């Protein structure tokens, strides 16, 4: 029986590399997968998942109004698994579509992304995945300052912490730092 998996972690926790690893494992056995990512993620290239260690792969971009269920249902070959990167940017509708892929098409879905933003609020996609997922797992990494478990994301601008602004600002290591709670409130900058 297929399940909806939500795997979350802070920045630099290896979420995308995990997607690429899972895809490779399925495909090594001749089992096709579908890799999708939010259309908002344009860090490297539109419609591409890319890890910080340099591995990359084409992906189907997901817009807020995309009918993911119909897209998967109408593929010429049923996938063995659907892998989603940057799931925090998904809309409520997108997440409910993913649940239908699992329940109605019996295709497992693994969604990877951030849980909370730089202000410590849940993203829309994360909120609905926490509500609907059958299995929820944390992908761990360490605080940049003290090596304790990182649970938050610190946004920086010109070397200074930022606690206000738009929820979504696409960026990488130059903008966001994985931190523990202590260093979120008192960063060593």
From Swiss-Prot:
Binding annotation for ATP: 9-16, 85-88
Organism superkingdom: Bacteria
UniProt-annotated location(s): Cytoplasm
GO biological process, one term: thymidine metabolic process
SUPFAM superfamilies: Glucocorticoid receptor-like (DNA-binding domain), P-loop containing nucleoside triphosphate hydrolases
Residue sites binding Zn(2+) per the record: 143, 146, 180, 183
Annotated InterPro entries: P-loop_NTPase, Thymidine_kinase, Thymidine_kinase_CS
Database matches in Pfam families: TK
Record field: catalytic activity: thymidine + ATP = dTMP + ADP + H(+)
Key words, A-Z: ATP-binding, Cytoplasm, DNA synthesis, Kinase, Metal-binding, Nucleotide-binding, Transferase, Zinc
Active-site residue numbers: 86 (proton acceptor)
GO MF annotations in UniProt: ATP binding; thymidine kinase activity; zinc ion binding
Enzyme Commission number(s) from the entry: 2.7.1.21
One GO cellular component term noted in the UniProt record for this chain: cytosol
Keyword RNA-binding: no
Top class in the EC scheme: transferase
NCBIfam families membership: PRK04296.1-4, PRK04296.1-5
Assigned protein family: Belongs to the thymidine kinase family.
Subunit structure: Homotetramer.
PANTHER family noted in UniProt: THYMIDINE KINASE, THYMIDINE KINASE, CYTOSOLIC
Protein name: Thymidine kinase
Source organism of the structure: Streptococcus agalactiae serotype V (strain ATCC BAA-611 / 2603 V/R)
